[in-house]
Amino acid sequence: MKRKVRVAQYGCGKMSKYLMQYVLDKGAELVAAFDMNPEIIGKDVSSVIGCDPVGVKISPADEADAILKATKPDVCVIATRSTMAELKEAFSVCAKNSVNAISTCEESLYPWNSSPDITKELDALAKEHGCTLCGSGYPDLFWGTMITNLAASSAHITKIKGSSSYNVEDYGIALAQGHGAGLTLDEFEKQIGNYNSLSSDEIGSLVEKGEYIPSDRK
């Protein structure tokens, strides 16, 4: 492909600052950006990235369909929320316009077990319009692979212990809410902590009913 890859950014919060910068650094062309925050709508994406003017204005998310039709990006990077239910609209509008899409949404890494109905619907939509919808998700698999590789070279393992820590302030509101930031102890236990006591069968039953939100396990 001799021309530049055309990219749209859906969601212009904290993570998009890095995502859009990566797009520009790698020589792609940023052609559209969408968000729901009235404080940044209408501004050049440079106000989020912190660079010289790019010439691309942040548009309201509800105008994505028309703008995707007009700009015809090759791919859309979605960085909004953490569950498939929350991502369904963004994925759908991309698929209907034959735009490939990838999301940072944790659940989108492999949503077939946790949100089967939504995933089947989006899968059919993507196939109908000849595009790909996928997720990068949180790299749990990456951390597990590191440990697996190290364990493979060991003759005897007594115990494996690992931890991951980060400041949720560095990420968006979705991650903060998924971790229970701002909740009282009682609210945290009710909304998040109680899920840790569920059996795999109980979780499976809730998933089938559409009542279980994967990010509640955080």
Feature locations, PLM:
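N-terminal glycine-/serine-/threonine-rich beta1-alpha1-beta2 phosphate-ribose binding loop
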Residues: M1-K96
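Active-site-lining helix/loop region of Rossmann-like oxidoreductase modules
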Residues: V5-R6, Y10-K14, L150-K218
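Short, ordered loop/turn segments at secondary-structure junctions
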Residues: M36, C105-L109, Y138-P139, S165
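Short, hinge-like loop/turn segments at secondary-structure boundaries
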Residues: V48-D52, K120-L122, A151-S153, G178-G180
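Short, small-residue-enriched loops and turns at beta-alpha junctions
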Residues: S82-M84, S108-N113, D140-L141
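Rossmann-fold NAD(P)-binding glycine/threonine-rich loop
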Residues: S92, E106-C131
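A short hydrophobic/small-residue beta-strand
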Residues: N100-A101
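Adenosine-phosphate binding glycine-rich loop
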Residues: H129-T158, S165
